[in-house]
Design a protein with these regions (language model features):
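Structural alpha/beta surface segment adjacent to cysteine/selenocysteine redox centers
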Residues: 17-116
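Short pre-active-site segment immediately N-terminal to redox-active cysteine/selenocysteine motifs
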Residues: 9-12
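C-terminal cap of thioredoxin/glutaredoxin-like
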Residues: 2-3, 15-32, 36, 55, ...
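Hydrophobic "anchor" residues on beta-strands that sit immediately upstream
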Residues: 6
C-alpha cells in the first residue's frame, strides 16, 4: 500500500533543504511517495531576513552548517539580501506539480538558492529552473507574470493553516506529524505506524 508523506516547507528555509536527504533515504525502496506542500515563513509584507544580520549568521554557524556536515549535504548561506519572498517560487511549484514535476522542481529550487545562491524571488531565475526541467519556459513565465497559479498557492497555504502548521519542515503521515529535520529512524517509525494503522 502506498504511503504518502506530506512535507510542508519553505524554499528559503535551510532546514527544509536539509530534510530532503533523510526523506529520500527513508522513502528509498519503499512504497512511499513524498508530496511537498508550501508554507511561507515570511509572507509579503513581512520583512525577510538579511544574510549579513546576526540572527542568520549565528544560526548558520551554530546549527545549519554542523547539521549539513553531519548529513553530508553541501549548503551555503546565500548572499541574496534581503532574502527573497517564496510566493512566486511556490506558484512555479504549482505549475510544475500540475505537470508531475513538483518533486524535481523542489529539488532544483532548493539547490538554486542554497548551493548556487540564486535569487529565487525573480521570475527570470525561476524560468531558468523550469527550462532546465524541460518545462515550457515561455508558458511558465507567462503563468507567473499573470498570477495563473496564485489561487492554487493560496489554497495550499489555507490548508497548511487548517492543519495548524507553524514550523517547517513539518512531515505528516496519516495525520501524525514530525516537526524539524527528521532522522531516517524517526521517519521509519512514522511510516511503520502508518502501515500498521492502514
Amino acid at each position: 500500500m502506498l504511503t504518502t508523506i506530506e512535507v510542508f516547507s519553505d524554499f528559503v528555509c535551510p532546514f527544509c533543504y536539509l530534510a530532503e536527504q533523510p526523506l529520500a533515504d527513508a522513502a528509498d525502496g519503499g512504497d512511499v511517495q513524498i508530496a511537498w506542500r508550501p508554507f511561507e515563513l515570511r509572507p509579503d509584507p513581512t520583512p525577510t531576513l538579511r544574510p549579513e544580520g546576526d540572527y542568520l549568521q549565528s544560526t548558520w554557524q551554530q546549527v545549519v552548517y554542523p547539521m549539513a556536515e553531519r548529513l553530508g549535504v553541501p549548503i551555503v548561506l546565500p548572499r541574496v539580501s534581503p532574502q527573497p519572498y517564496s510566493r512566486l517560487a511556490f506558484e512555479g511549484f504549482a505549475y510544475a506539480e500540475e505537470r508531475a514535476l513538483g518533486q524535481r522542481y523542489t529539488e532544483r529550487i532548493f539547490r538554486a538558492f542554497f548551493v548556487k545562491q540564486r535569487d529565487i524571488g525573480k521570475v527570470e531565475i525561476l524560468t531558468d529552473v523550469a527550462g532546465e526541467l524541460g518545462l515550457d519556459a515561455d508558458d511558465f513565465r507567462a503563468a507567473l507574470e499573470s498570477g495563473r497559479y496564485a489561487e492554487a498557492h493560496q489554497q495550499a497555504l489555507r490548508r497548511a493553516r487548517e492543519l495548524e502548521i507553524t514550523v517547517v519542515p513539518t512531515v505528516l503521515v496519516d495525520g501524525r506529524r514530525l516537526e524539524g529535520v527528521p532522522s531516517a529512524e524517526a521517519l521509519h517509525r512514522l511510516f511503520d505506524g502508518a502501515v500498521a494503522i492502514g
